[in-house]
Amino acid sequence: MGLFKKSSPFKNSAAVLADNGFTDAYIEALKKDIEPLKKPKDIAKGQSYLINALIIAGRLEEACSLYEKHSAENLFVKLDKMLYPNLLHNVIFAYFIRNKYKNAETIYKEKNDIVLRDTSDTMKRSLALHECMNGRYENAVTVLAKLLDSDCRFVDLCIVKTVLKLDMFSRANELSANFGEYKGRNELEAEAQKLKKKIFDGLSPKEKVRAVKKGK
């Protein structure tokens, strides 16, 4: 991958990523790598990496603002056929979590040929979110359920948020088992906590007792 080539303008931040993962330290290192860039293609690539990193870190509002700024400048048309769809999938997810459905749907519809360009799991996640945002919750759950054992990020948040639209509190409780992984991840942690509260409020008295005993 270009991110890890020795000649890559992102080699310094790539080293931080390899050592620390998608942390604030990586985000700051990436910002420093982007600053001196002159070529639009390199800037587009760097900003796409940055937006994705911000989303993974749960800094969703910041990521969306950055996307909106550079999208208005048509910067991302410089991205290659793999990076551009992945960026759009992640931004759609960020808007979905922030309940900015109109923004997510605008990307899905206006850039539909790019969003649906591949058959990746992230594309399937975007398709499911589109179904959910249009009230077709059963369709969304069907698609997301098939992604639960995949490497696609954030599927548990997406499916729990969707299952709760169907008032399936017990199922949502089961699907939220790994929400602890979002601890320290800003807006993602806040969303996980909000969903857990909604789940608990909807459980039967017996299920609530069971959940408390399990420390959920």
Outline where the language-model segments fall.
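Flexible helix-coil transition and linker loops at the boundaries of alpha-helical arrays
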Residues: 33-43, 72-82, 112-120
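Eukaryotic alpha-helical solenoid repeat scaffolds
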Residues: 21, 153-216
